[in-house]
Amino acid sequence: YKFKTSNCTGTVTFGAAGYVAKDKEMPVTLDIFAAEKDFTGVMKVTLPGENGKGIAYQSAVKCKAGEKEKIVLNVPQLGNPSAICFEIMDSFGVTELSEDVSFSDAKNRNGAFSEQAENLIGVLSGQSKELSYLNSLKIGEESDEESVKVVCYSKNSFPQTEEEFQGLDGMIIDSFDTKSLSGKQKSALKSWLKSGGKLLIAGGGQQIDSFEGLEKTFGIIQEDVVVSELYLADADNTVQELPILM
């Protein structure tokens, strides 16, 4: 949802692009703009705990006048996810914004929470509508099926930090020119893959556009089989190999 204080404006998004995966950490993303003066404070998310006591998580917020900042705080899903309190406080502890966020609250349906699913799959594609059939998929045994929800990204909305990938079970890059992604976005994707994220590169005849922009950053080596390797060199020159389906 959108917010406005005496000095700041911005948006707060709960989940991956507004979608929440069950039983996974939930990224809370604050996009903030400070208008007339610098803002220093904290963003705070309070979840319901035992005996009616809330459990709070917070992250520092620093934003210079006339600039925008993005802060991502990952929180576990505890108790009733429909009862979440979001706050922004300044450096003196004065509350600038306090909102109780609810799944059922009409004003949050298209912003804070759009939908819950057992599995969230991110899609970055030039033809995302053609992949909408993935939303009807069920995975697992018939007696224990889990739903799949596709989270569509554009060049502008694609994550810029590893934390923003939290909650996603995988990412599909399909028929998309990855050369248009920023260095921040590529670095975030790289970090997420190193921490266990899964990436599928597709696109048929346009597959070259999908991996060409990642080739230099990641060292993708396309082989004659459908699986390639991603070689990531750490600071100590040790090499980590990660499979990427292509």
Which role does the model predict for each range below?
Residues P27-F33:
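Short edge beta-strand/loop segments characteristic of extracellular beta-sandwich folds
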Residues G49-P81:
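Intrinsically disordered, low-complexity Pro/Gly/Ser/Thr-rich segments with frequent PxxP/GP/PP motifs
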Residues K37-G52:
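Short acidic, flexible loop segments centered on an aromatic residue
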Residues Q160-E163, I173-M246:
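A glycine-rich, often tryptophan-bearing local segment used as a flexible ligand/cofactor-contacting loop or short
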